[in-house]
Design a protein with these regions (language model features):
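PLP-dependent amino-acid enzyme catalytic core
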Residues: 1-217, 221
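N-terminal low-complexity segments that are often proline-rich with Ser/Thr-Pro
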Residues: 223-225
Length: 225
């Protein structure tokens, strides 16, 4: 199922994105003793993979939905991606950012056409506010990760990798909210079942790993309540 959805997303967004290079890193290969290849998403529009998900989500909406108002919450990359996608499709967007946001990242979002609203001390407070405003006004909130169309859009990285090499033993994917690894890992597992998918997070911001460690599976009795 995920492969067909990602393939559909790839067809939908192809004219709007860059197919980024997939290049061998001689330095990292030498350092690790493995053959290491890099998917150069830093060369994607807006400078990150986030644009894939944002433009796929926006293209999945109809005209009335787009014109109802586009809202996002971000500290930088997702906001820039939603802003550029909105600009391409000719609709305004509002991005909620925390008070301590980088001025350089704010300016980048403004350059792509975002209307910036400063709210709260962290991105989660901004996300809650953006969702609330979108719900109250009939607008659309564009999540950075928690949306199937975002996942399928970001999964197009894997669709490209599949066409750029004959196979991989292992792929290491950075993880924040989990949108990219859901799309990339799901797609590659469907075409190369034996591939090992490894999630990587910075030690000082390992929110996904901490969430998984805190999760407690419900008992059968709880499920019957």
């Amino acid at each position: 199922m995920i492969k067909s959805n990602v393939d559909n997303a790839a067809s939908r967004i192809r004219e709007h994105i860059r197919q980024t290079p997939f290049e061998k890193s001689e330095l990292i290969s030498k350092m690790t003793g493995a053959e290491v290849w890099l998917k150069m998403e830093n060369q994607q529009f807006t400078g990150s993979f986030k644009f894939r998900g944002a433009i796929n989500k926006m293209l999945s909406l109809n005209d009335a939905q787009r014109k109802s108002g586009i809202y996002a919450a971000s500290t930088g990359n997702h906001g820039a991606a939603v802003a550029l996608a909105s600009k391409i499709l000719g609709v305004p967007c509002i991005v909620y950012v925390p008070e301590n946001s980088s001025e350089a990242k704010l300016e980048n979002m403004r350059n792509f056409g975002a209307d910036i609203k400063v709210f709260g001390s962290d991105c989660m407070e901004g996300e809650i506010e953006a969702r609330k405003v979108a719900d109250n006004t009939g607008g659309i909130y564009v999540s950075p990760y928690n949306d199937p169309e975002i996942v399928f859009g970001q999964g197009t990285i894997a669709e490209e990798i599949h066409s750029q090499c004959d196979g991989l033993d292992t792929i290491i994917v950075s993880v924040g909210g989990g949108g990219m690894i859901s799309g990339v890992g799901g797609y590659l597992k469907s075409v190369w079942p034996d591939i090992e998918v490894i999630a990587a997070s910075p030690e000082n911001h390992a929110v996904m790993i901490k969430s998984c460690l805190l999760y407690t599976s419900p008992s059968p009795r709880d499920l019957l309540k």
